């Protein structure tokens, strides 16, 4: 019967062969389910080998819920060092915040295996109310090997706060009087928030070299893209120490940002003037390939003639223009056709022949419509002119008067408008600029860069 079987299995827990003991632990759990937990815990308390501990831990994980994990508490006081370590690991596996107070004292245990298990477990057990305890421990711990685990625990506790705007509050208060800023500041990358970002930027600007390094690493690992503006400023400053990693951090944060493709394109354009190497340009082109917009395609197309960027540009253009797995339609138009025709010639890599064939096939099936025209070429004011009156007044003017006034308006354009760094610049005074052609179906993507006393708009 079952009782005789269980008796045999229980006896097997004491077998000399560790493999038999491991099988016995698994068998007891399989046969008795949660009812096996007390016997397995008793075995855990007396087992001296790591193999036995791993076997009983596995068996307990297969049958334990919150009620069963609570039975482990006596092991923390009565069990051997190796049993306490296993109990702590099981509590961490359960992720019950109620065990934080049980485990916390063992983070200072003189027994290294127990101490290491406890420190690592805190990240799974900590809640918002436990932050000050973790800050005290993180600030005072002597063994630097534990710093990263305690930082993870503090981040876990803070981010458990349901209100994202206050997740950094406890840490920020502690930083006002802490002598361990270098340990607390990196956690702010996970907790985020404007006040936290402002503090890190201030410490970066005013701190000593070591603090500047810590703050910079915090900025590049910031959890959302709100630090991208700071990283851009570091890139623009041409700081030789931080500039390269700031560039890469900016690209990473924009790539993962929860913003539209159009907004990402504007940010990539913003950093593009500082992509002075082919590697940087190709990194931006790789990211452009993720943006299914016409402006992204047109921008990628401008890099097709440079041998150092043509391959990355071609790959990006192909991915942008051709239909995706989610859509049966791709992009079309004269500019698209021109870019894809050149793309087919620039593709490289092991799948280049296949990709080339795919592009050629798509070109053959593309609608013959003219498609979108670019209103601004990024180089000069071709297609733009000075504005004469408003449309209603202009429609009532004699042709000869309109032509004369248009010539006068055009003469004023160079004094008021110019192109620099791929942008149309207005000096803040003078007349309006308008397109030469009239457009009835258009998409306008505008990146406002208005400086102090700026005066410009669209109507």
Residue ranges and their predicted role:
Residues 27-30, 58-62, 90-93, 121-124, ...:
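Core register positions within helices of long alpha-helical scaffolds
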Residues 16-17, 48-49, 79-80, 110-111, ...:
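Short inter-helical turns and helix N-cap capping residues of alpha-solenoid HEAT/ARM repeat scaffolds
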Residues 329, 354-459:
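Carbohydrate-interacting regions of secretory-pathway proteins
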Residues 244-252, 283-286, 305-323, 330-333, ...:
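Alpha-helical, heptad-rich or low-complexity scaffold/stalk segments
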Residues 19, 36, 51-55, 82:
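Solenoidal tandem-repeat scaffolds enriched in leucines and small polar residues
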Residues 2-14, 33-45, 65-77, 96-108, ...:
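Amphipathic alpha-helical scaffolding segments comprising HEAT/armadillo-like alpha-solenoid repeats
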